[in-house]
Amino acid sequence: MVVAVYPGTFDPLTRGHEDLVRRASSIFDTLVVGVADSRAKKPFFSLEERLTIANEVLGHYPNVKVMSFTGLLKDFVRTNNARVIVRGLRAVSDFEYEFQMAGMNRYLLPDVETMFMTPSDQYQFISGTIVREIAQLGGDVSKFVFPSVEKWLTEKVAAMGGPVA
């Protein structure tokens, strides 16, 4: 049984993330979506909110587990007995950082492989950062996120005082 880990902040989870989960879950026996605590990144959504959102969007995949983690990815990978780390590459600009991370992960976890996946064409330009910015400016994010995520974004932006004009 091959277990893979797909780590990220998922702030918020986008259609691009779901596309990668759908495709990776068809390759591996179990795919663990690791929602990183990442307080240093100052996430828009709390860890609990991001876990809830991920479970709402991904809960129908029978071989996908959504879990949070803090600390080093290597420890999360070991805890889940994973043999593969899945990472998405949207553009060449992602590659340099991801390549460095894959090298460090290989050093820390010599028996674990990193698998890069590119998004489907319609999702290549989507990022959580861009989606958050559009939502905070009152724009339509419905093509980039699922309806439940759009609702979360709308409510969060409203709680922060509404869209920035």
Swiss-Prot record:
Xref: Pfam families: CTP_transf_like
Q: Where is this site: Transition state stabilizer?
A: H17
Q: GO BP, one example?
A: coenzyme A biosynthetic process
- Give me the residues that bind substrate, please: T9, K41, L73, R87
Record carries keyword Nucleotidyltransferase:
yes
Name the major location: cytoplasm
State its Enzyme Commission number(s).
Answer: 2.7.7.3
Binding residues for ATP = T9, F10, H17, G88, L89, R90, E98, Y123, Q124, F125, I126, S127, G128, T129
Known pathway: Cofactor biosynthesis; coenzyme A biosynthesis; CoA from (R)-pantothenate: step 4/5
Listed cofactors: Mg(2+)
Print the keywords alphabetically.
Answer: ATP-binding, Coenzyme A biosynthesis, Cytoplasm, Magnesium, Nucleotide-binding, Nucleotidyltransferase, Transferase
InterPro entries given in the database record: Cyt_trans-like, PPAT, Rossmann-like_a/b/a_fold
Record's catalysed reaction(s): (R)-4'-phosphopantetheine + ATP + H(+) = 3'-dephospho-CoA + diphosphate
* MF annotations from Gene Ontology: ATP binding; pantetheine-phosphate adenylyltransferase activity
Repeat found in the keyword field: no
- Cellular component annotations (GO), alphabetically ordered: cytoplasm
Top-rank EC class of the record's enzyme? transferase
Q: Where does it localize?
A: Cytoplasm
Per the record, the similarity remark reads: Belongs to the bacterial CoaD family.
**What biological function has been recorded for the protein in this entry?**
Reversibly transfers an adenylyl group from ATP to 4'-phosphopantetheine, yielding dephospho-CoA (dPCoA) and pyrophosphate.
Quaternary structure, from the entry: Homohexamer.
Q: What is this protein called?
A: Phosphopantetheine adenylyltransferase
Q: Which organism is it from?
A: Burkholderia lata (strain ATCC 17760 / DSM 23089 / LMG 22485 / NCIMB 9086 / R18194 / 383)
